């Protein structure tokens, strides 16, 4: 029995001497890359879901909830629509001569003057909005033979009956309404916008009381255009106590052109003109509050950052905004392929290289070295290969933003009911554009992600090949991203391999001797694992024999009793 115990002990000692890492005349050097416990899934051309160590979201999917007042000049319409402010509704007098980059119309806005309609409302609204100003210049029209500045109880200015401040309601004087024929030249170097209207009485009696004639007519002409409107007399739905209406029209007079107004009744005359400016001002319907902040991009939901190339907040935008796409998320890979580190390394705790898995906890770089030698184990990052990968990835996000950010705004589009088919066509075109952009965005991101992953894999392979060329025949590729170094390689030696100053000639003879020297059981990797497992099994068997022998000896001495009952 003592002989068996002694042999078992000797065998274990010999076996232990041959475990990996105990040979001080060799070392192991592994190359690896950064890994995280939980990576981010991205899409590439070849794979719908591939895990990377880091990724950046490219789609802005939320707003600040408020419209920033900088750097754009925001004009809050409050209770007024832009057209009401243009006409001079009494409760919109505060908007006279105002300027803006973006006019914000609220859902609570209302008209509080004479009931009116604008046959080409959307065009007028868009024209004035893009002009960015309500600057108004009064002109002296000669309205001889009629009474001016008519008012209505439906349009109070304070406690007095009043009317739109930018329009002049003309009606009979001493039961007479002569034919009016007035001209006004444009001697300036800018376009003039004239707003005028036609009154539609609710009854024939109202018509004759105001304009004497049973039917009036209004003709407004320039060298380029002419509009003739015949009033439609008849009752309409009651609004603010009135069943009559005013139709609002507009005429643009170019420099050198002339405005001609001819009427024998029902004319709502202009008091002057608005200056038309060319610019990128706009209008937006929104109930988002206006706050003190800064943002280049504004949507009806509120301002959004424009540091991402895409947004999913709203199709309607103003300013330099990300491109609208349908996707809620598009992630751009800004790190390498993630292969989480295995928590166990087998029975003997060997280190492993990048072919098996990544390394967690590498905070100094993306690529690096781990070693195991006579001085212990260690790890260090390779800053050169890390920087090479980062330099190529860093500008990727900025390049995508430059390709996609719009330097103009997407305005609201309105059409009258008559233009319904045009509206349907326009909507189809817009939807098609969004579909195309959404597809292009997904394709662009997938291509960039594929390039990033290929790039980072390539840097890893470059570092591995660089190390292989340094070590040459002094080491053996273990097939898992590691090298078995066949000479004593302390930490200084390992450092020289990392920084590229390793001289393989210095260690060549020692490495060759160690390669061919037989130490115990030195086997090639094809049979080494088998022998180790067989040796371990024999050791366990011998230990079991020892334990069984002890039990039998104890039974013979009477120290242990064994009763078998049937």
Curated annotation (Swiss-Prot):
Glycans are attached at residues 38, 54, 79, 138, 142, 181, 301, 499. A lipid is attached at residues 555, 562, 565 (S-palmitoyl cysteine). Keywords: Clathrin- and caveolin-independent endocytosis of virus by host, Clathrin-mediated endocytosis of virus by host, Disulfide bond, Fusion of virus membrane with host endosomal membrane, Fusion of virus membrane with host membrane, Glycoprotein, Hemagglutinin, Host cell membrane, Host membrane, Host-virus interaction, Lipoprotein, Membrane, Palmitate, Signal, Transmembrane, Transmembrane helix, Viral attachment to host cell, Viral envelope protein, Viral penetration into host cytoplasm, Virion, Virus endocytosis by host, Virus entry into host cell. One of its GO terms (molecular function) is host cell surface receptor binding. GO terms for biological process: clathrin-dependent endocytosis of virus by host cell; fusion of virus membrane with host endosome membrane; fusion of virus membrane with host plasma membrane; viral budding from plasma membrane; virion attachment to host cell. Homotrimer of disulfide-linked HA1-HA2. Binds to sialic acid-containing receptors on the cell surface, bringing about the attachment of the virus particle to the cell. This attachment induces virion internalization either through clathrin-dependent endocytosis or through clathrin- and caveolin-independent pathway. Plays a major role in the determination of host range restriction and virulence. Class I viral fusion protein. Responsible for penetration of the virus into the cell cytoplasm by mediating the fusion of the membrane of the endocytosed virus particle with the endosomal membrane. This is Hemagglutinin.
């Amino acid at each position: 029995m003592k002989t068996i115990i002694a042999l078992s002990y000797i065998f274990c000692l010999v076996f232990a001497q041959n475990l990996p890492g105990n040979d001080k005349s060799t070392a192991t050097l592994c190359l690896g890359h950064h890994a995280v416990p939980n990576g981010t899934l991205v899409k590439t051309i070849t794979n719908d879901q591939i895990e990377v160590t880091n990724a950046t979201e490219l789609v802005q999917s939320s707003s600040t909830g408020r419209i920033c007042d900088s750097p754009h000049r925001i004009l809050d319409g409050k209770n007024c629509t832009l057209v009401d402010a243009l006409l001079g509704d009494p409760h919109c007098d505060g908007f006279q001569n105002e300027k803006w980059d973006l006019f914000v119309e609220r859902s609570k806005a209302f008209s509080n003057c004479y009931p009116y309609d604008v046959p080409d409302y959307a065009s007028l609204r868009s024209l004035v909005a893009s002009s960015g100003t309500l600057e108004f210049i009064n002109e002296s029209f000669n309205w001889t033979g009629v009474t001016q500045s008519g008012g209505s109880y439906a349009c109070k200015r304070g406690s007095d009956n009043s009317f739109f401040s930018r329009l002049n309601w003309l009606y009979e004087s001493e039961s007479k309404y002569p034919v009016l024929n007035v001209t006004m030249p444009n001697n300036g170097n800018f376009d003039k916008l004239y707003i005028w209207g036609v009154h539609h009485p609710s009854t024939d009696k109202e018509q004759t009381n105001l304009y004497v004639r049973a039917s009036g007519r209004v003709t407004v002409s320039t060298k380029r255009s002419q509009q003739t409107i015949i009033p439609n007399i008849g009752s309409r739905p009651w609004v603010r106590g009135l069943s009559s209406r005013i139709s609002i029209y507009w005429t643009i007079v170019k420099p050198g052109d002339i405005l001609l107004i001819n009427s024998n009744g029902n004319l709502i005359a202009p008091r002057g003109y608005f200056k038309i400016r060319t610019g990128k001002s706009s209008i937006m319907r929104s109930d988002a509050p206006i706050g003190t902040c800064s943002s280049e991009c504004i949507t009806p939901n509120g301002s959004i950052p424009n540091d991402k190339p895409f947004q999913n907040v709203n199709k309607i935008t103003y300013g330099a905004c990300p491109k609208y796409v349908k996707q809620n998320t598009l992630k751009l890979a800004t790190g390498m392929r993630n292969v989480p580190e295995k928590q166990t390394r087998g029975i003997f705790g060997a280190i492993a290289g990048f072919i098996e898995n990544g390394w967690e906890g590498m905070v100094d770089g993306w690529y690096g070295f781990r070693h195991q030698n006579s001085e212990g184990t260690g790890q260090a990052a390779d800053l050169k290969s890390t920087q090479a990968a980062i330099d190529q990835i860093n500008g990727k996000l900025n390049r995508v933003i430059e390709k996609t950010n719009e330097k103009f705004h997407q305005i609201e589009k309105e059409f009258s009911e008559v233009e319904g088919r045009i509206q349907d066509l326009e909507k189809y075109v817009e939807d098609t554009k969004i579909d195309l952009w959404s597809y292009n965005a997904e394709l662009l991101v997938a291509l960039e992600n594929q390039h990033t992953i290929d790039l980072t894999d390539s840097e890893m392979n470059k570092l591995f090949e660089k190390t292989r060329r340094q070590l040459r025949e002094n080491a053996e590729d273990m097939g898992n991203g590691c090298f078995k170094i066949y000479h004593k390689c302390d930490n200084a030696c390992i450092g020289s391999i990392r920084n590229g100053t390793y001289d393989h000639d210095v260690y060549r003879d020692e490495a060759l001797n160690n390669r061919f020297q037989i130490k115990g059981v030195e086997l090639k990797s094809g049979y080494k694992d088998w022998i180790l497992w067989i040796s371990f099994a024999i050791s366990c068997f011998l230990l079991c024999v020892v334990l069984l022998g002890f039990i039998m000896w104890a039974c013979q001495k009477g120290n242990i009793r064994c009763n078998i009952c049937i």
